[in-house]
């Protein structure tokens, strides 16, 4: 699928999502699969949690619009889901919701040779992120943080 058609598909799906007070968190099209797999992760615009029913209610109109658009001339699988474990934390709501959960923090390595830190999400302020690493609180300035993701305790 070329970039132009992917962009058209994304706009089409955003319109469907907006009608249901949803937004597209991410869109991934796996053209190396047969049939093509279209993975869509949705979020509610009001910040509430996405339910299984929300995913199901988005699926039918999204599929209908894809069919009407004729952007795909092949068979495809449409997968609708909500944001889940191992996703990046970005919003204030994410940080409040997942306080105490295990996180991976990817660092930019400007001031440190350490690339990743793992711990429990403790606190987020405007200037720093605090994580609990084996009972000790480590404050990391945000200018040193590249990415914060949920993980499992094994990670």
From Swiss-Prot:
One annotated GO biological process: translation
Keyword Ligase: no
Chief place of localization: cytoplasm
Annotated localization: Cytoplasm
Keyword Transmembrane helix: no
Cellular component per GO, a single term: cytosol
Keywords tagged on the record: Cytoplasm, Ribosome biogenesis
The family this protein is said to belong to: Belongs to the RimP family.
Function: Required for maturation of 30S ribosomal subunits.
HAMAP family for the chain: RimP
Protein name (Swiss-Prot/TrEMBL): Ribosome maturation factor RimP
Gene: rimP
